[in-house]
């Protein structure tokens, strides 16, 4: 009974989440919040001050840029699945994930996305802008899923982006997702 009461919080209107951890762990935390009955309020960690803070900075006017074979593309349909029916999505917001950093089976089979504002920590510090960008990522995953049996994610982004992306996971839309812990 006590556990049930702590899980459901019928009077709650928002879920406040501050988390640090590996990329797969953060994605998993977000995926536990997919029912959408609570507004999600995410926090990021300030490495200098050593505290969590809300996403209340001014927007950066960021937009997603898609690349395949180092060429700008508009349509992800040009990215083929590998022989195992898998396709990769490299999300480079904090640091750039290069083709040579990927497992060999994903070289030539991975869409690279980044922000037009460059690479840096806490690249999306404003809540609404982050929501908009992450919804676009979710749409890209769904597009890639149409071309493959599985989508593999390689992510270099702030924790809140990863949690938010996990919260948008829908099995019917995204299918099997494999989240890799990418290290630079």
Q: Which residue ranges define each predicted feature?
A:
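Structural motif
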Residues: 18-22, 90-95, 154-158
């Amino acid at each position: 009974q006590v556990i049930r009461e702590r899980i459901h919080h019928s009077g709650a209107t928002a879920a406040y989440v501050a988390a640090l951890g590996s990329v797969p762990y953060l994605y998993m935390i977000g995926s536990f919040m997919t029912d959408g009955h609570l507004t999600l309020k995410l926090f990021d960690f300030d490495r200098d001050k050593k505290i969590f803070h809300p996403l209340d900075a001014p927007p950066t006017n960021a937009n997603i840029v898609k690349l395949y074979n180092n060429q700008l593309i508009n349509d992800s349909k040009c990215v083929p699945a590998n022989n195992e029916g898998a396709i990769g999505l490299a999300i480079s917001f904090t640091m750039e994930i290069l083709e040579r950093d990927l497992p060999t089976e994903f070289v030539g089979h991975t869409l690279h996305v980044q922000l037009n504002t460059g690479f840096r920590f806490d690249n999306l510090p404003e809540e609404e802008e982050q929501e908009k960008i992450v919804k676009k990522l979710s749409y890209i995953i769904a597009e890639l899923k149409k071309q493959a049996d599985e989508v593999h994610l390689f992510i270099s982004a702030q924790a809140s982006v990863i949690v938010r992306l996990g919260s948008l996971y829908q099995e019917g839309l995204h299918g099997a997702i494999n989240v890799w812990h990418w290290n630079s």
